[in-house]
Amino acid sequence: MKKAIIIGSGIAGLAAALRLKKKGYQVSVFEKNDYAGGKLHAIELGGYRFDLGPSLFTLPHLIDELHQLFPDVEIDFNYIKKKTACHYFWEDGTSFEAPADLENFAVKAAEIFDEKQNTLSKYLQNSKMKYESTKSLFLEKSLHKSNTYFSKQTLKAILKIPFLGINNTLDQENKKFSNPKLNQLFNRYATYNGSSPYLTPGIMSMIPYLELGLGTYYPQGGMHRISQSLFELAQKVGVEFRFRKNVKKINHSNNKVTGVTTEKGTHDADIVLCNMDVFPTYRQLLQDIKAPEKTLKQERSSSALIFYWGIKKSFPQLDLHNILFSENYKAEFEAIFNNKSLYEDPTVYINITSKQSPQDAPKGCENWFVMINTPGDYGQNWENLVIKAKKNILSKIKRCLNIDVEELIDVEYVLTPQGIEKNTSSYRGALYGAASNNKFAAFLRHPNFNKTIGNLYHVGGSVHPGGGIPLCLLSAKITADLIPNTNA
């Protein structure tokens, strides 16, 4: 049986392990941590459970697909569709519970923001068109294989690109709204790939369709259940996991991969698939080949500063997903991307899974995942920044929600960009690999295969098609499609 080694058990590594197992490979996953899941991990603290990483669940069929690869194996994984996508708040008292469907969103947003319903409906239909026109090219195939460009579907997508807002920024696309709050709301979707709405291309206005058209979901048991269900499935179908095994080198001979070396020895393989960020992959594991410097020098995506707070009270006005908007969105992104600093009036995201899973917090309490977008780690004094950010966040909550939660904080855990990099090997703590702050970004990501070493492949948020749970899962699917079955 042919052997495949996977470096890293993030969501893309887990998905790739299952797909290669289905193709007949003997699969071993080497993971430096003592748990599977990468950023999709969780902690328990003083009776509160917190998902550490991604908090938004869309395109659940991509997880279902993986479970359906092995129909005879039963794994407990369920999810519900949310009626409300997100609850938005501004300092002037404006709030908007965004319905998670296109028609209701247009009706309610028109009422709240005094916008023409027709303008909203057209925008959302345009978002749908952009997604459906380009997903086959940008999300489901390798952009780095010539045969991708010869299908009728791909040629249709390419012909539509000039009409998809590629020459505008997302902010320019969103200027069609008369209310600046609505412009700000739709600009927020740039953060879904760690970019700035004032730089990322207008084609990114397809992202709202994923959330508002295809739906926002919640996995029962929390986001951690996504990675754990795949880990359990992989174990049951015979994937081997080697935890606390730090790969030191990817071995190759005559331009073909031969295996990996850990601290304790060499392991041979016919295929190696790396779920590690491409920057440390080249700098640490592939030091003996010429690295693609142009790719590695791309601007990194934003990172995050996250406070995990156990709150000794419940707040019925809040939902699973909540956003408290900055009064100056442009200045916030300039601070993050230009100055590599934190803005004094940050946009604050609060995720509360105890709204859906009451067992995640003691009775009458809530588990708050409180996040602000930040630059990556460029040597800033994070100890000082954490102190300042906490003060600014508490002040923002007070101004937007008229509540003082400082005295209600029961337990606290903090994760900085430094911590994210340490836990996940994401260079500078970037959440999505490279930023998408130019119109060619989709074509500049590292391919899913290595151009120098045969049978070496790459998956995860730092390669095509990008970061976030759905795109990481698609990277595994694209990559698996490039690898032949063992009987081929």
From Swiss-Prot:
InterPro entries: Amino_oxidase, Carotenoid/retinoid_OxRdtase, FAD/NAD-bd_sf, hydcarot_desat_CrtD. Its EC number is 1.3.99.27. SUPFAM superfamilies: FAD/NAD(P)-binding domain (SSF51905). Coiled coil: none annotated. It comes from the Bacteria. Pathway: Carotenoid biosynthesis. The keyword Flavoprotein applies. FAD binds at residues 31, 39, 55-56, 247, 275, 431, 461, 468-469. Keywords: Carotenoid biosynthesis, FAD, Flavoprotein, Nucleotide-binding, Oxidoreductase. It catalyses: rhodopin + A = (3E)-3,4-didehydrorhodopin + AH2; 1'-hydroxy-gamma-carotene + A = 1'-hydroxytorulene + AH2; 1-hydroxy-all-trans-1,2-dihydro-neurosporene + A = demethylspheroidene + AH2; 1,1'-dihydroxy-1,1',2,2'-tetrahydroneurosporene + A = 1'-hydroxy-demethylspheroidene + AH2. Pfam families: Amino_oxidase (PF01593). One of its GO terms (biological process) is carotenoid biosynthetic process. GO terms for molecular function: nucleotide binding; oxidoreductase activity. Belongs to the carotenoid/retinoid oxidoreductase family. Monomer. Can also 1-hydroxy-all-trans-1,2-dihydro-neurosporene, 1,1'-dihydroxy-1,1',2,2'-tetrahydroneurosporene and 1,1'-dihydroxy-1,1',2,2'-tetrahydrolycopene. Probably involved in the synthesis of myxol, a gamma-carotene derivative. May use FAD as a proton acceptor. This is 1-hydroxycarotenoid 3,4-desaturase. It comes from Flavobacterium sp. (strain P99-3). The lineage of its organism: Bacteria, Pseudomonadati, Bacteroidota, Flavobacteriia.
